[in-house]
């Protein structure tokens, strides 16, 4: 189900393109609660993400950008880093702001659904889709669904010793991973 795929996996799908092609289709996605994906075009000084759909402006308010932002467990850099990258969201409202129609979006709702619905049914040994988001000397950070990150340690990447994860992976690469353990 596209709800649980990593960000970037549905941006070019037929359904996503259809729902983002016109205001009428966009409203249909709103009514149905369909998860959509588009590139964040900017981040303002309040750390709200903006998406320009052409026919309407979209805003993901700071607190709706990621799980943990309001609590302080997720840093604002996690929001800023999404600029010019695909973000998955649902439309929570369409209203007039400063004289123009604006779509209010939420990424956090989809992340909460992932934690509440997908993670509990996942088990060690499951093979899942992931997208490489960041490379470090000690491993690869991957989006495992709706912007939720997981670590693939360097010692689990290859049977032979490698000097850095960039020998095997690059940022943005779509991969399959096996769940080794799940932190509570």
Task: Cite the ranges covered by each PLM segment.
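Single-stranded RNA-binding regions, centering on S1/OB-family and related RNA-binding modules
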Residues: 1-184
């Amino acid at each position: 189900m596209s709800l649980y795929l990593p960000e970037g996996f549905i941006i070019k799908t037929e359904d996503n393109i259809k729902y983002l092609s016109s205001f009428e289709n966009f409203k249909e996605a709103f009514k149905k609660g369909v998860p959509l994906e588009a590139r964040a075009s900017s981040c303002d000084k309040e750390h709200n993400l903006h998406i320009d759909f052409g026919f309407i402006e979209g805003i993901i308010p700071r607190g709706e950008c990621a799980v943990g932002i309001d609590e302080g467990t997720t840093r604002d850099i996690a929001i800023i880093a999404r600029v010019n990258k695909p973000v998955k969201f649902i439309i929570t409202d369409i209203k007039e702001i400063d004289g123009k129609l604006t779509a209010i979006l939420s990424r956090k709702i989809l992340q909460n659904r992932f934690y509440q619905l997908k993670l509990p049914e996942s088990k060690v040994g499951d093979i899942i889709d992931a997208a490489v988001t960041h490379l470090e000397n000690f491993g690869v950070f991957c989006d495992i669904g709706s912007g939720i990150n997981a670590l693939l340690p360097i010692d689990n990447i290859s049977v032979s010793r490698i000097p850095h994860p960039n020998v095997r992976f690059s940022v943005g690469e779509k991969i399959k991973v096996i769940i080794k353990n799940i932190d509570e």
